[in-house]
Amino acid sequence: MAGDMQGVRVVEKYSPVIVMVMSNVAMGSVNALVKKALDVGVNHMVIGAYRMAISALILVPFAYVLERKTRPQITFRLMVDHFVSGLLGASLMQFFFLLGLSYTSATVSCALVSMLPAITFALALIFRTENVKILKTKAGMLKVIGTLICISGALFLTFYKGPQISNSHSHSHGGASHNNNDQDKANNWLLGCLYLTIGTVLLSLWMLFQGTLSIKYPCKYSSTCLMSIFAAFQCALLSLYKSRDVNDWIIDDRFVITVIIYAGVVGQAMTTVATTWGIKKLGAVFASAFFPLTLISATLFDFLILHTPLYLGSVIGSLVTITGLYMFLWGKNKETESSTALSSGMDNEAQYTTPNKDNDSKSPV
């Protein structure tokens, strides 16, 4: 019996870590595939709109069946909150992120997203959702150092390509022409990095905003479904920035259709629900610490599935990123242990002091 209880505690302790790892590994594969779809020439916000619509359709039955008895009543304020959530975490974020992805590569996009823990941590300190005093503790210093190492690994991977260490040859989807756009993409490389950075900041703001929203509206399936519905319409409006041709919405390329469905189901519905749950469990800073894994996942997916060359810089940068992530989680674990020990000590103190008060009140005068 005691062994079963201990097993349950272990599962409860590590389930957020397992879920966040799986979620971000999946996101790495989504980013690599979406990059290939963008190279075909599809309007990036058309991909975003379809992706959000598919996410909403997938989540409707889950929200209805699993949360119909626990779902709070929708108020106008909650509708506005989900509209803002859709802007920060989906439509505007995708507008800048996919635009930057079209100018750069899946590896670079994931590398810049790897700075999410640092940005979220800094914003959390600014908005006071993280305590400034933790910087004076060992756990706090481990989190800061781990975050800085994550950033270093991401920057190393981005700016140091290094020699090719594999014999794989780049493989691209048939019918897509890359040669004519190579020079344009090289010229817009810095602009693409700027767009990706803006997208990462928006994603950080969404994670902090979602931390508050998940308390007011704790139904993760319904919340993600509402967010996806609003974001689908927002993406459709933002698509007018690039083109107003109705034919852009007609997609007959099977590869692109497959990527959009995969991105909607896995990259939006599943990962957003998982991230929302992770934020609710252990906070926005904790959830953001796993985003560097998308970098490693995208690099491996490019190499093993899409057969793009593997470079030394990618390997070294990935190893440095993993080291930083491990240090951050180490610090987070120490912080959790300290909080648990403190609360246990307070409970024990209350347990011992309460009987004394009762005895004093019953003692004769």
From Swiss-Prot:
Membrane disposition: Multi-pass membrane protein
Any GO CC annotation of this UniProt entry: plasma membrane
Subcellular location: Membrane
Statement: the UniProt record of this protein carries the keyword Membrane: yes
Stretches that traverse the bilayer: 14-34, 46-66, 83-103, 107-127, 139-159, 189-209, 221-241, 255-275, 285-305, 310-330
Bias (Polar residues) ranges: 340-356
Protein origin, superkingdom: Eukaryota
GO BP term, pick one: seed development
The keyword Disulfide bond is assigned to this record: no
Ranges where the record places region Disordered: 340-365
Keyword terms: Membrane, Repeat, Transmembrane, Transmembrane helix
Xref: Pfam families: EamA (PF00892)
PANTHER family on file: WAT1-RELATED PROTEIN (PTHR31218)
Family: Belongs to the drug/metabolite transporter (DMT) superfamily. Plant drug/metabolite exporter (P-DME) (TC 2.A.7.4) family.
This protein's name: WAT1-related protein At1g01070
Species the sequence originates in: Arabidopsis thaliana
